[in-house]
């Protein structure tokens, strides 16, 4: 049950008394703390006082609760709280007063505010004294707060009215009181107060009347308060200032103004301001009370100079025309002048350079003449190449020089130079006008595309060339800035004024937004501001009838109409793509309501003619967006506009160049739009009526094709369509061309697609030579030129893209006229690069590539697109000719080289998304000659930054590397393989280029790992491939392979890698990788894991069904290297049959790979046509046979011992007699007999030996291994033919050693000596025959004739030893070990010279070395892998026999220790250890006469355990090492160490026997002789005593108790003595001494006394 009881419900009086008492104690404690705080404050220990006050306010009776209320109140507590807060406030004030000079201003203010807080809080608990009121009055004075000062003064005056009455006489007042009255009087005057408040006593009023004329001494103001007052005054001044924004303008333009103003408000999309919260200005945290603009002084001067007359700035005019043609037309020259004054793409002025800097630039000026020579060379190369295609008209430097261009004939080129010279933002916008999406979105149906095209073209028309706003804006902008800065207008006012200036109708009848070309950024700002304050603008304009104001309404209506077009277009696109469009519909509805409201307002306004037409035309444009073409209102509206415009023939044109969805307004454009609507209505009706028929649609496309290509045609609606096209504006015709190109591209009609492209390009070029172009102003011509170039680029890119996607960059029967069109465009674009050369010549010209980076990239792309098409067109025209094909091929390569050098010179050859380099790569890979390869290397660097032996650094152009795609990688790899290894086998060539190796590694890394499971054909092939290696090696397998009938039924996957694999990509990559592995292996740096990637690569080549026998051969070599590595470095994998399985399987794989390679070669060698390739393949085939024969021999001999020729039986379950099932043990059966293995080896090696054309080229190993097999299998056959083959091998080895100059080949010579010795021993050879065979190799030995005269066996053996030593003397690397062993074996066997044999064997074995090696031999280069482990085992056994012969069992014991650590250095290490242990134990037993049964087992049975423990302990205590023979101790210690190393029981007998025989028993006997009591006598253990027996040295006085022992069956006396022995507890069972007990004593004795 809870023990809680609410206090307010408790009736316990004791509890209330306890609370009261506790509260009283807290009050007392608070008083003490308060007094301490006062003392510290008085002593100015501010920090201590602060801490004390903090403690005070932590007491419950002082601090309020969380709501600021006090639970208990009393006069004492109120007084205490008042004093606490009062003095705490004074503490903060005093601290600030003393330290304000060292404090930050923020800290000073913080302390003053805390002072106010505490003092004001004190007033809540008591009446303030004079100190508090005067301090508050001073602080409020420093705050400049009259209201707070008046409050405190009135508080002071009304605090004690009686005191004021008593002190009504001024003479009776204190100075402070007079000062209060004086301040209050002055304050009332300042506030213009005539009557006092009602709470002021009348006595105060009397004093105030007197105080006005009385002089009162002013109190001194403390410095702290003066500082506070100054800060407050400064803050007040700052607050009075307007919160404005100063915008720094980088240029005098409306765009800069608009973007700067836009940056002041939060950014959002224009469509997002269509809702209720339209103006983002409301999201600002603080208002913008005024806006001001600042401009750069230098920019002002530049703008001022731009308004000067041409005569006032001759240097600008000179700069402008320095690259312009001379002309007699003054108007044109004047027009060009302002454009030259424009700066870079951002329209920023260039900084001035110092004279010293200019001089430095002049010194480093490039060789311009050399640059001109470069252009001359390039143009000559291009002309010569084009002559082959029949292009007679040359391009010349003279016509490209701007000073030589004829005005009328090459006006477009002259205009192009003008643009490059004076490029500004407006030129960038001109260039962007031609950029639009080429493809038509929507249905793939062709007729529907045509309908959509007509419908989309209704929203826009031709972009009429118009003057740029930047040409006239400087003075207007300057005036605008001046007005804003002078008047300090609010942001709203500045924004409205900005909109008004740009949207209103000017005095000259123009409107900036419709009649001048703007940048998109400026239009976006105007659109954003207009829609943001649309409601305010409507309210302002709606009651007005002023034309200027109403014109703003028309402009805003046009802006909303254009926005409606954008929304409707996005809505249509999203519907066509199946995306969500709910938000767009909502935006459209909101905007529609605004448009309707403005439309109704404008209908009621009186409009001038131009405004009326603008309003009607924008209304018509809005109808086009929002209604269907069948809407009658649409037709009525445009008919009314057309009829009205006919009444005003001088109306002119409203350009609308800034609107995407409002076309230009003129009678011509109205009629064009009307025509489009009529045509669209016709198509719509046809589409409805012929919903299921397609013929009509095709007819319209066919008619359109004939009309645009000017081909005669007839048919329904042909004339109407012809009329429509002829009257269509330029952009409409352009869209029709795009429609046709898309149509024929989708139909893959290459011929018509190609014809349409070249016809459309001619159409675009004709625009630049038209009369209309000639009569335009310079700026208009520049606009037309740049937009036309963009259109040419878009058409060319589309044409190139379709060629790549559909027809692999191939043209269909291109004509010379078509090539001439491309050459004309190229010639027009050549000023792009020629101008860069001129900039290096003339310092006043700035590089176009540097001043307009983005625009230059666009034109560079066009340049490279045209150049790429030129190359392709020239290639297909030249290759049509049958004669002089090599010359034509050279012209193609020369053209590629010239164009690449040109683009690379100016560092843009990688533009056009790398397609220019892609074209070169594609074409150059078709020509397998040195010239093509040279240029291809340069292309590879520029495109991928892959360097393949680039000799000239200038060929390494500054480009950005592109990632290589798989298709290009395969194409290039096939080319390089074909180019480098033409009609040759790569395995035969000795000089493989390392440059290609890097390339192939890059390609293989790009391709990556192949997922066989992703392709069912590869999965199938992989399964058969793996199954092949599980089959055993049988005689039938070898026969089928040798007959060429052995194969695996692979299928080609024919995927994207097939061509690359067939071309040899994976095969060549594997060859390079394997060569690298061999080189690393030779220097012992290779790792077998490196072979995994090579095996995987070769496996891929095989699985793709290439039927390349070399791949199988190399795969076998890889597995051979794996086996060699397993058998060379360590014998761990040879320790048991299970461990050898992995190596045997790899060896089996190698043999099977060789057999498959053999079969493939024999079945396909007749298909090779080239004699050179046949000879190369024959050499590879010979190497294959040698590898196969060697591998089969290696698998047959030790240490593998034919494991690869076995097969594992499947598990078998046997039913036993008791009915249970039993698994038979797994067994291995030979898959081929040993006889057949050896026959196959002999046949293969013999066949390989016959394939050598010259005798000196023969491989010495072939006859060597054949003779070796004969020697091992049949000595008779060896005598007949084997010895001759061996002598042949010695001759070849000697010849090849002298030719190569490397280490001598000694294996054959040793084999000859060894085999002759063995054959003489087994009587195969007689002495004379053996000498005769040895003399055949005297060319190597070089012995004089008399040394060959041997008459007896001993002399023959000495001759053998001399020959073996001579072989060792020729061993430079000292790796030959077999002759040493043979010498030792002959000395031991024939001469019984054990010491001499051991001396020889000590050269091979190192028992006393500190390392773990026992046998110091290594595998010679020509020795079969793994044989050195066999030989090491043989040498160890032979050495142990020699030691045993010398009875050196201690050395044998030492061998045991080393053999345990040398286990990985030979085979059968455990057998060797067991033999060494056996020899050591037997030797120790013989040497020390040890009998384990007598001195071990029987003795342990007879000794009582207590006696053994007691005596063993005494023996341990009395043991001295010098009392025993050293040989006994050495054997004892060695046996223990050997036992300790293996924990084996083999050494237990030796250790225990020595312990009892030489230590324990003599100690007991000595004990028996020295004691007066009967000592235990143990029968039959008295062995031979050492001379210094410990029994002679035991003290005589030592007593020895009699030990119980077992009765001896041999003597009766022992029985009597035993009967007299006292026995304790005879009924107990006696514990016997075990081996473990004895060995514990042995361990203790050795480790404590001997170690």
UniProtKB/Swiss-Prot annotation:
Positions with biased composition (Basic and acidic residues): 333-365
Entry function: Has a role in a nucleosome assembly pathway that is required for the integrity of heterochromatin and proper chromosome segregation.
Keyword list, A-Z: Chromosome partition, Nucleus, Repeat, TPR repeat, Transcription, Transcription regulation
Composition bias type Low complexity, residue spans: 1589-1609
Region Disordered, residue ranges: 1-22, 333-368, 1575-1632
PANTHER family, sorted: CALCINEURIN-BINDING PROTEIN CABIN 1-RELATED, CALCINEURIN-BINDING PROTEIN CABIN-1
Taxonomic source organism: Kluyveromyces lactis (strain ATCC 8585 / CBS 2359 / DSM 70799 / NBRC 1267 / NRRL Y-1140 / WM37)
GO biological process: chromatin organization; chromosome segregation
A molecular function (GO) term: nucleosome binding
Protein name (database record): Histone transcription regulator 3 homolog
Coiled-coil stretches noted in the UniProt entry, renumbered to this chain: none
Highest taxon listed in the record's lineage: Eukaryota
Ranges of compositional bias, category Polar residues: 1-13
Localization (cell): Nucleus
């Amino acid at each position: 049950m809870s023990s809680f009881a609410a206090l307010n419900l408790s009736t316990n009086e004791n509890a209330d008394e306890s609370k009261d008492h506790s509260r009283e104690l807290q009050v007392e404690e608070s008083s003490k703390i308060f007094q301490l705080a006062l003392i510290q404050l008085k002593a100015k220990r501010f920090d201590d006082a602060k801490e004390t006050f903090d403690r005070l306010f932590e007491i419950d009776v002082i601090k309020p609760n969380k709501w600021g209320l006090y639970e208990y109140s009393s006069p004492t507590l109120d007084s205490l709280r008042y004093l606490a807060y009062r003095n705490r406030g004074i503490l903060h004030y005093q601290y600030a007063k003393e330290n304000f000079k060292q404090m930050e201003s923020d800290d000073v203010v913080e302390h003053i505010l805390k002072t106010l807080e505490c003092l004001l809080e004190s007033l809540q608990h008591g009446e303030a004294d004079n100190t508090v009121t005067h301090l508050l009055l001073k602080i409020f004075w420093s705050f400049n707060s009259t209201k707070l000062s008046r409050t405190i003064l009135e508080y002071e005056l009304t605090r004690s009215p009686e005191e004021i009455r008593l002190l009504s006489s001024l003479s009776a007042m204190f100075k402070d009181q007079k000062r209060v009255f004086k301040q209050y009087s002055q304050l009332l005057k300042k506030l213009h107060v005539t009557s006092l408040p009602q709470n002021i006593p009348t006595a105060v009023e009397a004093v105030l009347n007197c105080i006005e004329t009385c002089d009162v001494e002013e109190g001194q103001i403390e410095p702290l308060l003066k500082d506070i007052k100054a800060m407050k005054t400064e803050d007040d001044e700052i607050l009075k200032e307007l919160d404005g924004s100063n915008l720094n303008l980088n240029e005098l333009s409306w765009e800069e103004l608009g973007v700067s103003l836009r940056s002041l408000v939060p950014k959002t999309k224009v469509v997002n301001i269509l809702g209720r919260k339209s103006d983002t200005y409301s999201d600002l945290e603080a208002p913008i009370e005024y806006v001001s603009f600042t401009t750069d002084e230098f920019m002002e001067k530049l703008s001022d100079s731009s308004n000067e007359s041409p005569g006032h700035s001759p240097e600008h005019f000179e700069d402008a025309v320095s690259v312009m043609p001379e002309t007699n037309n003054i108007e044109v020259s004047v027009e060009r002048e302002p454009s030259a004054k424009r700066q870079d793409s951002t329209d920023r002025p260039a900084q001035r350079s110092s004279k010293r800097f200019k001089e430095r630039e002049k010194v480093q000026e490039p060789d311009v003449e050399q640059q001109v020579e470069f252009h001359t060379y390039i143009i000559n190369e291009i002309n010569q190449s084009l002559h082959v295609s029949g292009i007679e008209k040359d391009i010349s430097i003279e016509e490209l020089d701007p000073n030589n261009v004829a005005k009328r004939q090459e006006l477009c080129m002259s205009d192009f130079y003008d643009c490059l010279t004076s490029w500004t933002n407006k030129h960038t916008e001109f260039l962007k006008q031609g950029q639009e999406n080429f493809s038509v979105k929507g249905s793939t149906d062709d007729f529907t595309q045509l309908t959509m095209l007509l419908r989309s073209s209704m929203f826009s028309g031709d972009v009429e060339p118009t003057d740029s706003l930047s040409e006239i804006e400087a003075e207007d902008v300057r005036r605008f800035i001046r007005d804003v800065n002078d008047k300090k207008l609010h942001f709203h006012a500045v924004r409205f004024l900005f909109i008004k200036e740009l949207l209103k109708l000017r005095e000259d009848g123009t409107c900036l937004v419709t009649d001048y070309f703007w940048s998109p950024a400026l239009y976006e700002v105007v659109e954003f501001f207009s829609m943001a304050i649309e409601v305010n603008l409507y309210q302002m304009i709606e009651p007005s009838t002023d034309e200027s104001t109403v014109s703003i309404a028309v402009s805003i209506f046009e802006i909303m109409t254009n926005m409606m077009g954008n929304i409707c277009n996005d809505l249509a696109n999203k519907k066509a793509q199946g995306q969500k469009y709910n938000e767009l519909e909502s935006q459209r509805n909101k905007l529609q309501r605004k448009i309707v409201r403005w439309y109704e307002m404008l209908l009621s306004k009186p409009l001038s003619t131009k405004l009326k037409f603008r309003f009607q035309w924008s209304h018509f444009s809005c109808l086009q967006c929002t209604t269907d073409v069948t809407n009658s209102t649409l037709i009525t509206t445009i008919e009314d506009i057309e009829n009205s415009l006919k009444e005003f023939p001088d109306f002119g044109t409203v350009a609308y160049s800034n609107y995407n969805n409002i076309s230009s307004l003129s009678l011509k454009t109205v009629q064009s739009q009307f025509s489009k609507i009529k045509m669209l209505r016709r198509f719509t009706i046809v589409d409805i009526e012929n919903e299921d028929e397609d013929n009509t649609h095709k007819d319209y496309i066919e008619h359109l094709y004939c009309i645009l290509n000017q081909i005669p045609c007839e048919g329904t609606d042909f004339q109407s369509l012809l009329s429509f096209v002829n009257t269509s504006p330029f952009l409409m015709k352009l869209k029709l061309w795009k429609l046709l190109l898309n149509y024929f591209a989708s139909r893959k009609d290459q011929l018509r697609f190609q014809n349409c492209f070249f016809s459309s390009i001619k159409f675009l070029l004709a625009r630049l030579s038209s009369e209309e172009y000639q009569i335009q102003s310079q700026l208009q011509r520049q606009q037309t030129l740049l937009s036309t170039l963009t259109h040419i680029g878009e058409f060319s890119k589309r044409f190139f893209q379709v060629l790549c996607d559909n027809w692999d960059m191939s043209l269909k029967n291109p004509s010379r006229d078509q090539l001439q069109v491309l050459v004309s465009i190229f010639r027009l674009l050549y000023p792009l690069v020629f101008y860069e050369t001129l900039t290096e010549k003339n310092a006043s010209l700035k590089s176009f590539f540097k001043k307009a980076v983005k625009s230059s990239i666009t034109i560079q792309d066009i340049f490279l697109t045209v150049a790429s098409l030129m190359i392709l067109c020239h290639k297909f025209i030249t290759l049509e000719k049958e004669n002089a094909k090599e010359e034509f091929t050279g012209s193609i390569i020369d053209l590629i080289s010239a164009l690449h050098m040109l683009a690379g010179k100016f560092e843009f050859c990688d533009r056009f998304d790398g397609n220019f380099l892609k074209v070169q790569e594609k074409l150059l890979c078709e020509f397998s000659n040195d010239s093509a390869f040279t240029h291809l290397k340069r292309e590879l660097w520029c495109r991928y930054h892959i360097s393949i032996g680039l000799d000239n650094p200038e060929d390494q152009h500054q480009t950005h590397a592109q990632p290589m795609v798989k298709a290009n990688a395969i194409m290039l790899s096939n080319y390089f393989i074909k180019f480098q290894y033409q009609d040759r086998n790569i395995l035969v060539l000795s000089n493989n280029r390392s440059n290609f190796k890097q390339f192939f590694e890059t390609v293989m890394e790009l391709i990556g790992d192949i997922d066989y499971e992703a392709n069912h054909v590869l999965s199938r092939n992989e399964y058969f491939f793996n199954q092949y290696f599980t089959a055993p090696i049988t005689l039938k397998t070898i026969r089928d392979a040798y007959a060429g009938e052995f194969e695996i039924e692979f299928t080609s996957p024919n995927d994207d890698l097939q061509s690359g694999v067939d071309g040899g990509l994976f095969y060549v990559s594997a060859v390079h990788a394997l060569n690298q592995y061999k080189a690393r292996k030779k220097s012992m740096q290779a790792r077998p894991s490196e072979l995994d990637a090579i095996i995987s690569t070769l496996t891929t080549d095989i699985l793709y069904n290439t039927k390349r026998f070399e791949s199988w051969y190399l795969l076998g070599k890889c597995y051979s290297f794996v086996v060699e590595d397993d058998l060379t470095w360590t014998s761990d994998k040879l320790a048991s049959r299970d461990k050898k399985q992995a190596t045997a399987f790899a060896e089996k794989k190698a043999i099977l790979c060789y057999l498959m390679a053999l079969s493939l070669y024999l079945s396909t060698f007749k298909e090779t046509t080239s004699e050179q390739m046949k000879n190369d393949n024959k050499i590879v085939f010979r190497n294959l046979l040698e590898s196969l024969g060697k591998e089969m021999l290696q698998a047959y001999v030790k240490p593998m011992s034919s494991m690869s020729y076995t097969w594992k039986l499947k598990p078998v379950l046997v039913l036993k007699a008791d009915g249970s099932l039993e698994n038979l043990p797994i067994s291995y059966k030979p898959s081929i007999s040993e006889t057949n293995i050896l026959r196959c080896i002999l046949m293969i090696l013999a066949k390989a030996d016959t394939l050598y054309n010259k005798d000196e080229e023969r491989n010495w190993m072939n006859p060597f291994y054949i003779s070796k097999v004969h020697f091992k299998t049949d000595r008779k056959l060896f005598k007949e033919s084997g010895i001759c083959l061996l002598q042949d091998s010695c001759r070849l080895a000697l010849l090849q050693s002298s030719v190569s100059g490397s280490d001598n080949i000694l294996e054959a010579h040793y084999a000859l000596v060894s085999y002759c010795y063995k054959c003489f021993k087994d009587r195969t050879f007689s002495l004379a025959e053996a000498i005769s065979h040895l003399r055949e190799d005297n060319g190597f030995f070089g012995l004089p004739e008399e040394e060959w005269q041997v008459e007896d066996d001993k002399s023959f053996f000495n001759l053998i030893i001399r020959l073996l030593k001579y072989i060792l003397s020729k061993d430079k690397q000292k790796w030959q070990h077999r002759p040493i062993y043979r010498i030792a074996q002959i000395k031991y066997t024939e001469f019984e010279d054990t010491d001499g044999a051991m001396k020889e064997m000590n050269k091979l074995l190192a028992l006393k070395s500190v390392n773990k090696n026992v046998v110091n031999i290594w595998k010679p280069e020509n020795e079969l892998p793994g044989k050195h482990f066999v030989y090491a085992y043989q040498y160890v056994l032979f050495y142990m026999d020699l030691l045993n012969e010398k009875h050196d069992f201690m050395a044998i014991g030492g061998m045991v220790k080393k053999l345990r650590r040398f286990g990985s250095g030979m085979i059968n290490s455990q057998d060797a250890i067991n033999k060494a242990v056996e020899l050591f134990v037997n030797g120790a037993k013989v040497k020390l006469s040890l009998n384990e049964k007598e001195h071990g087992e029987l003795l342990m049975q007879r000794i009582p355990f207590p006696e053994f423990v007691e005596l063993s302990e005494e023996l341990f205590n009395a043991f001295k090492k010098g009392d025993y023979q050293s040989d006994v101790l050495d054997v004892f210690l060695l046996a223990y160490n050997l036992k300790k190393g293996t924990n084996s029981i083999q050494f237990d007998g030796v250790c225990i026997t020595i312990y009892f025989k030489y230590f324990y028993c003599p100690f007991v006997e000595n004990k028996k002789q020295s004691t007066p009591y009967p000592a235990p006598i143990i029968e039959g253990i008295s062995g031979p005593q050492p001379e210094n027996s410990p029994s002679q040295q035991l003290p005589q006085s030592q007593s020895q108790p009699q030990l119980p022992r077992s009765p001896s069956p041999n003597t009766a006396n022992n029985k009597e003595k035993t009967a007299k022995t006292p026995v304790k507890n005879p009924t107990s069972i006696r514990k016997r001494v075990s081996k473990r007990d004895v060995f514990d004593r042995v361990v203790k004795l050795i480790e404590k006394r001997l170690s």
